[in-house]
Amino acid sequence: MELKDQLMQQIDRERLPQHIAIIMDGNGRWAKERGKQRLFGHQSAIQSVREVSEASAEIGVKYLTLYAFSTENWNRPLAEVSGLMSLLATTITKEVSTMNKNSIKLNAIGDLKSLPEANYKQLMQAIADTSHNTRMTLTLALSYSGRWDLTQATRRMAEDVAQGKLQPDAVNDTLISSYLSTAGMPDPELLIRTSGEERISNFLLWQLAYSELYFTPKYWPDFRKADLYEAILNYQHRERRFGKTSEQVTKK
């Protein structure tokens, strides 16, 4: 029996995280170590996205959110950004049939209107073409940052207050969450970051408040189903307290 199958059998399906978020890091370094251009790393990472998406859906995860392109990534060399946009366009179009086969619904969050028009249209078409799927929602964070998300939510709330649609004393945690781009999704219980970096890099700043963080030295292009299962097993061995004592959690 392969390692991935052994690990999958150890997972407690009753204690799965509903929502897993992943910072897919290390594509450039992975390519550089092989004497290749950074774009080669991004191209090679597509297989990781495919495997992790399929594995998540197979075991019963309901939401998978991937940090695909941050607002800060626009500052990268033009050739890399152009290559990424081209790769995004071709990949999304190619993967629609696979997502439908696995009943995976595509979603996207971020400043999507800042994407090139062709990319935006292809993305919206893929979202529409998979909207009937119910097994899992795969969300791509594109031109996204946590600060952008909080800023747009605050701006919209301020507009609603100014128009008399919202009373200031009605603002609470739940209301703020409803204005974020992830409205309607549970907060991630588990955040995975590859490549050995141990920071959240402006990703889902509000939503990660109580998430368990899992860091692996493996670069994203090398991340496979077995690695996902190891992260989930690590999560299942943790005690989530939400501010309570260990005794209170055990008693519950």
PLM-predicted stretches and their roles:
Residues M1-K252:
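Flexible, compositionally biased loop and terminal segments
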